[in-house]
Amino acid sequence: MPVDKFLARAGGQRTLSRFQDSLCDFLATGSSRSLCGTSLDFPDRVLVCTEGPAGMEEASSPSFRQATTVEGMVSPEDPTLSKEGLSAKGPPPSPVLPPFRRKCRKCGICPQEEEKSGFSLRFGQRPDGDPPECASPEAFAGPPRLLSSKDTEPGEPGGSWVECAVETEVENMLFSKDGVAPDSLDHLFEFPGLFGGEPLSLVTQEPLQSPALYPEVLTEDSTDQQEVQPAFVVGSPGTPPDPVGPEDKAQSGSRMELEQGLSAPANSCASSPEPLGGLDGAPLEQRRPTHVKKRPWTSPDDSSQDHAEGASKKDFPRLEARVPRGVKTVYYVYTGSGIRLVGAASSSQPGQIEPLEELDTNSARRKRRPTTAHPTPCQSDPSETENAEPHQQRAEDPGEQGMTPLDAGVRSTVVRAMQEVLWTRAQELPDLALREDEVEAIAEGIEEALFHLTQDTNLRYKNKYRSLLFNLRDPRNVDLFLKVAHCDVTPNNLVQMSSIQLAPKELSRWRDQEERKGLDIIEQQQKELYRLPASKLTHKGEVEIPRDLDQMLTLEDLMEPIVPRECSLQPLSTPLEDTTNWHQHHQCDSNCQICTGGEEGRKADDGSQPELQVDISYNVDRKSSTKLPAFSGVIMNREENAIQKAPGPAPASSPEVLKVGETPPKEPQDRLQMPAGLKNAPPSPPPWEGSLDMFSIKHFRAKAQLISGHSCQLVQALPDVIRSAGRLPPSHVWDLLDSMGPSKAKDICVIRLCPHGSRDIQNYRLLYSYLNNKQCHCLATVQQVKMVLLPLPAFEPLPARLRPLGGPGLEITHTSLLLAVLFPKDALPDTATSIPVSNKVPKTVSFSKRVERILYSPEDRRSEATSSPLEEDPKQSLARGSLAPRSVCAPQSFPRGRGRQGPGWGQWSPEAAWCYSQHPSSAGPVFPGIGQGQHLHRASCFHHDLLQHLKVLVTMSHQFQASLWPQSQDSLPPSTVVSAVPDPPGPSLGPMDGGGSNCPPPEGSDPLEPPEHEC
């Protein structure tokens, strides 16, 4: 039955007019009371409902679903409302309804039984069509004020609740008979059979007031949002309607069912879960909040007064519902075609509406993006706790949700700083035509790419910004700035470049060099680890583990016992090419076997058998004894064996030889025995022997062996004790070597320091390990010589800077040793009277005048023969620098031009002078079978060759005897030589033969040429 017919039957035309007046008064006063204090203009018909997450279901309850509208709610639920009361009681007879009749004047809120309404609608449109004064989400947050039965005073006419309920229901709902579009959702609000069986639909009067605030209303795709559902349920509590199926409308179409629903008991639990009906028919449940709080709600007394003035006049308490965690307040709008979703109330910004997101999309985005560095809201306030999760979700997606003011300030600062740097660099390059707007665009593009890369203004964002700013501001990095200015590098590629790629070329080149140096140092350290000896840490520090003597042997020492004995018995076809016969002219020579006695001494220490090698030379003597006389062969063999093998001190009966099990061979009985003094003679002394006192290492004895150089002059100037003066870097030694002039460079020599005995080996190794680990050289304190000690690891060759000095050098398979480089100073002491070694005989010597007297004055020679140097003490002879008696080893030389004089008394022919120059020992011993005096022969004469050979052997014999003779003895050993001074030649002008007879020169011969003598 239509409403107008129903009212006409109940009270006539008067009742209908009073109803219309009451409706206008209610809409004029109720909207101003419920919507005061709002700042936004919402649509006329907005429904506010409390929704939970989609898919959450709870236990069903027969109560209705809560619905909240923008402008008020009507609760038709009352136990007094029944079918009989509705049909029996008519409208009140009062002519005019008061405008504030339905307002609760006691507390401004609705009673508890009216708060449990299952269906309530309210409109904000006034009858005259004006929009509401204010509409704010704050007004929608809590349950709005509901109409109560108490608004009808008992004394007032027509104050029954039945009349109030009917009027309230009609006042808040406008129905129309017009048809509904097929796609409209107005069928949710149709009440078939309620008033005469005609369906009633909701009437939409005006379009939206502000379409810009609700963009989703203008799109048809927004109707597909199914995450949140509308909050309307029409029908009985037990059977919520299904808006899809048409048969559901028939089930709830009876008037009796609606009346039973309206007369539901008022004591239903307000906090019980309620069924939630959606647009798609999916059942959802929502728990109504159980805690509400009152707070003042200002309302104007008169609707015509201003809102600010009215708000200050009167305050009313308001119900504020606390939304549980995870629940949002959702706003809908009624349109001509249905209900549109507006959005949810913003928890961080009051009075604003934020768009909703799909739950699946939001959760997936939360998993993909890391949590931002924004501070978490304080948990002390429950309202802030409930709003923490939406705030975090909005901050995770800056593009969709927007930036915070802090992020916006940081980004603007970065753009401004980048623009200033680029513009400053552009001013430094006048050739670069770059406008200010272009610079600003480049800076904004770089910042946008940087923010897109980091997705936040976090620490990574700031570090990358500083790196870009530093490299763009660097004046040396012009290439990077030009690439950015010419857009050769895009902003996306620029922010993804590493610090090495952004750096200038000079810095990159320097980094590469430093990396190579580091790698070289690491490789060198790894190589040195294999060369260093094993060491251990004790309470005294790092101590080197001593090795056995077998481990110190070289490959050459290990290969010597393997050589077969027959291979070493080969005869020597030619004599050794050495300078032993010139030993009287030098102090130390690398080619002299006497000077390099350390090599033979080392072989003797390794267990070699010198007596066996002496016997080998005797076998050679037997083969050559047929050519030479017996006496000459014996002397030559003795001298050669003594020179080559005498440094070996081990006798034939030494324990080492007996330990091996070899017996010394028997000497032949027909040969002469060596003197006892030569057999037991000690080895030749090394160039230097003393002790070393270096750093904190205990001093030890050592001896020197020449390695490089041609002079032992500096070696002999060394003191007995050498002490350390400090450490030097390796480069200092080479600089000192380069600073030496040519005159001093010839005196530089390198010696090898060897431990003197087994007790000194450990300290010797400690000194080597110390210098090798420190990678330094040791400077010694010597007054007249600059001495530098340097370590040389095993199997390493001599440094290339020391090889040009000459000398024997080092063997390839040598152990770890200490080398000493000796540099000369300004002056040397007088004690070092040795002469540098030279391949040629010096032109002048200290006794050249005496030699001339001997050669050219026979009387003087005879007088000198009486005072033979044999009577002189050997110590005095050695003190003058000669190791042999002067009568035997004195070199003789002729002055230039003297050989061209004619033969006469006291003068010799040039050939005779040449013969004497070849044989400096003019006074040779007299042997049986050879006459006294000198007998000069031709070069082709057999006796001439024999005489030269014998003279050389005699000279070598006396040199060796003088060098081996101990200094403690006062007299020379007995010699088989009868006289070392020959008789002077006779008065004849010609030479003498072997028997002392004169050999007259043949007729017609040149007197300047030597006479030919047929033998």
Curated annotation (Swiss-Prot):
Disruption phenotype: Male mice are infertile with spermatozoa completely absent in the epididymis. Male germ cells show derepression of transposable elements (TEs) and DNA hypomethylation of TEs. Residues 304-320, 388-397 have a biased composition (Basic and acidic residues). One of its GO terms (cellular component) is nucleus. GO terms for biological process: cell differentiation; DNA-templated transcription; gene silencing by piRNA-directed DNA methylation; spermatogenesis; transposable element silencing by piRNA-mediated DNA methylation; transposable element silencing by piRNA-mediated heterochromatin formation. The keyword Nucleus applies. Residues 373-382, 967-978 have a biased composition (Polar residues). PROSITE patterns: TFIIS_CENTRAL. InterPro entries: SPOC_C, TFIIS_cen_dom, TFIIS_cen_dom_sf. Residues 410-530 form the TFIIS central domain. Disulfide bonds: none annotated. Residues 73-97, 118-159, 213-320, 344-406, 643-685, 858-906, 967-1015 are annotated as: Disordered. One of its GO terms (molecular function) is protein-macromolecule adaptor activity. Its main location: nucleus. SUPFAM superfamilies: Elongation factor TFIIS domain 2. Keywords: Chromosome, Differentiation, Nucleus, RNA-mediated gene silencing, Spermatogenesis. It is found in: Nucleus; Chromosome. Residues 688-791 form the SPOC domain. Signal peptide: none annotated. Interacts with DNMT3A, DNMT3C and DNMT3L. Interacts with C19orf84 homolog. Interacts with SPIN1; promoting recruitment to transposons marked with histone H3 trimethylated at both 'Lys-4' and 'Lys-9' (H3K4me3K9me3). PANTHER family: SPOC DOMAIN-CONTAINING PROTEIN 1 (PTHR11477:SF18), TRANSCRIPTION FACTOR S-II ZINC FINGER DOMAIN-CONTAINING PROTEIN (PTHR11477). Protein adapter that acts as an essential executor of PIWIL4-piRNA pathway directed transposon DNA methylation and silencing in the male embryonic germ cells. Recruited to young transposons, which are specifically marked with histone H3 trimethylated at both 'Lys-4' and 'Lys-9' (H3K4me3K9me3), via its association with SPIN1 chromatin reader, and associates with the de novo DNA methylation machinery and repressive chromatin remodeling complexes. Following this, PIWIL4 engages with nascent transposable element transcript to direct piRNA-directed DNA methylation. This is SPOC domain-containing protein 1. The lineage of its organism: Eukaryota, Metazoa, Chordata, Craniata, Vertebrata.
